[in-house]
Amino acid sequence: MARTKIALIGAGNIGGTLAHLAASKELGDVVLFDVVEGVPQGKALDLSQCGPVEGFDAKLKGTNDYADIAGADVIIVTAGVARKPGMSRDDLLGINLKVMKSVGEGIKANAPDAFVICITNPLDAMVWALREFSGLPHNKVVGMAGVLDSARFATFLAEEFNVSVQDVTTFVLGGHGDTMVPVVEYSTVAGIPIPDLIKMGWSTQERIDAIVQRTRSGGGEIVALLKTGSAFYAPATSAIAMAESYLKDKKRVLPCAAYLSGEYGVDDLYVGVPVIIGANGVEKIVEINLSDSAKANLQVSVDAVKELLVACKGIDSSLA
């Protein structure tokens, strides 16, 4: 019986963390790809030596050749330049678009049946471009943003309410950027919606508004503190949750950047919405009723993503 194969494109901080998580969870054998010679090989060797201590038998291989991703069941793409202080996600557009082109062509030639998760920023534009360059079905290419943004929102809410993060369920829609939409009315503690908790005196609207804003700039807060790069532990953990739902056919409801063709009034665009991920990839897009303010915020987010796509088409005419 063939073992499951997970290919990680990009052997930076997120790629290395993904490799460790995938191996330690025994999700499958891991191929770590990078264009820089020696880096993926060194990280794979280092990580494989965790096996005897942690007790995993997953094989790890580092490579600079796309041929080695052949037959991958899941591909997680982190290749590209990370944000530095003062950079917006959109500043990365030109550099990372070129990276997506080579990655997309590598996937198309070697692993056209894979389920692909993109993490590269600016996320909503890069996942769209990666899908275009790879030619894979839309339901097999998604972007990791909402799981991470929702986790950040949940972390801050758990701190505010002094409750376990396990009992906090949050919902973040829209683009992965300053226009994201944390939906307060669908976020709960043990099933109790946040607006009800405000009425119960657990918090105030002003404090929740501040948490929403902190969630929006959650990535930037970490970039400013690290000064040399961006978040990698939580992004990797979030992508692994998505991969696991696909590989184990768990059918988890997760917010992801998914391709919309009419849902939420959006067409031909990747935007963060709740989806069901199972063995067929994105099996269903969950359309929830939004308040007028959430709808308006989502539209702002959609418009921001559209602007990025116009810029992408301006940089690479093959996308037009």
From Swiss-Prot:
**Single GO molecular function:** L-lactate dehydrogenase activity
List ligand-binding residues for NAD(+). G10, A11, G12, N13, I14, G15, D34, N96, I119, T120, N121
What keywords are annotated for this sequence in UniProt?
NAD, Oxidoreductase, Tricarboxylic acid cycle
The alphabetized list of GO BP terms reads:
lactate metabolic process; tricarboxylic acid cycle
EC number(s) reported in the record? 1.1.1.37
Question: Which InterPro entries does this UniProt record tie to the protein?
Answer: L-lactate/malate_DH, Lactate/malate_DH_C, Lactate/malate_DH_N, Lactate_DH/Glyco_Ohase_4_C, Malate_DH_type3, NAD(P)-bd_dom_sf
Question: What does the record give as the active site?
Answer: H176 (proton acceptor)
| Superkingdom classification of source | Bacteria
The residues the record assigns to binding substrate are R83, R89, N121, R152
Q: Which reaction does it catalyse?
A: (S)-malate + NAD(+) = oxaloacetate + NADH + H(+)
Name the HAMAP family for this protein: Malate_dehydrog_3 (MF_00487)
Could you tell me what this protein does? Catalyzes the reversible oxidation of malate to oxaloacetate.
Q: Which family does it belong to?
A: Belongs to the LDH/MDH superfamily. MDH type 3 family.
Full protein name: Malate dehydrogenase
Annotated organism of origin? Rhizorhabdus wittichii (strain DSM 6014 / CCUG 31198 / JCM 15750 / NBRC 105917 / EY 4224 / RW1) (Sphingomonas wittichii)
State which gene encodes it. Answer: mdh
